[in-house]
C-alpha cells in the first residue's frame, strides 16, 4: 500500500502568476514537504517530571512561547503550555519518543499522516502570510512558531529562516487543499514556482 500525500491532487510543478523576469529569491518557491515524523507531546497537569531533564535527538523541551528547539534533523515547536509539536526527518525517532515519554506523564500522538505541510521560500513570504492572517508577522523572528488562522483555516507557522524568508506551514490534512489554494492565490501577485 502506498501513501497519498495531502496535496497530491493540487500541487503541480511549474511557474505561476507574475513570474516573468523574476529570479532568485524574488520568485517564491512553494513545495509540499513529505515523509516527516510529526508528533504532538503534551505533559499531563499532574505530572511532576521536570521537562529540563528530557532529551530528544539532543534537544530539550522548552516551555516558553514562540520557542523552537532545533538541530539539522529535528525541530520542536512550542504549541502551548506543556504542549509541543516535534517535527523530524528521522522517522525512527518515534521509537525513542515512545521510550522517553511515559504514558503516566505524557500524551504522545503521531500526527504524521494527519497534517498537510507546505514550505514557502522567498522575499515576499511575509506579505503572502499577511494577506490571510491577523497575526503581525513583522514581529515573528527566525526559529519562532505560532498558531493562527489563514482565511479561517487553523494553521501553525514555523519560521525556518529570515534571509531569505522560509516558512513551514502545518494544517489539518482535511484543510490542506484549501490552505494550499489560499496561499497560492495570495502568491500570484509575486509569482511563484512549485517544486
Predicted features, each with a name:
Residues 1-195:
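Basic, glycine/lysine-rich polyanion-binding surfaces/domains
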Amino acid at each position: 500500500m502506498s501513501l497519498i500525500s495531502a496535496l497530491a491532487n493540487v500541487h503541480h510543478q511549474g511557474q505561476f502568476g507574475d513570474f516573468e523576469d523574476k529570479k532568485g529569491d524574488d520568485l517564491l518557491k512553494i513545495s509540499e514537504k513529505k515523509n516527516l515524523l510529526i508528533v504532538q507531546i503534551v505533559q499531563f497537569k499532574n505530572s511532576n517530571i521536570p521537562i529540563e531533564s528530557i532529551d530528544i535527538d539532543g534537544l530539550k523541551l522548552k516551555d516558553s512561547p514562540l520557542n523552537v528547539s532545533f538541530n539539522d534533523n529535528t525541530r520542536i515547536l512550542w504549541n502551548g503550555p506543556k504542549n509541543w509539536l516535534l517535527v523530524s526527518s528521522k522517522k525512527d525517532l518515534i521509537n525513542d519518543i515512545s521510550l522517553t515519554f511515559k504514558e503516566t506523564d505524557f500524551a504522545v500522538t503521531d500526527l504524521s499522516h494527519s497534517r498537510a505541510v507546505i514550505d514557502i521560500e522567498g522575499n515576499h513570504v511575509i506579505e503572502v502570510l499577511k494577506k490571510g492572517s491577523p497575526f503581525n508577522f513583522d514581529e515573528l523572528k527566525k526559529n519562532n512558531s505560532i498558531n493562527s488562522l489563514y482565511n479561517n483555516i487553523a494553521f501553525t507557522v514555523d519560521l525556518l529562516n529570515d534571509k531569505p524568508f522560509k516558512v513551514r506551514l502545518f494544517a489539518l490534512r482535511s484543510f490542506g487543499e484549501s490552505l494550499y489554494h489560499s496561499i497560492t492565490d495570495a502568491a500570484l501577485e509575486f509569482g511563484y514556482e512549485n517544486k
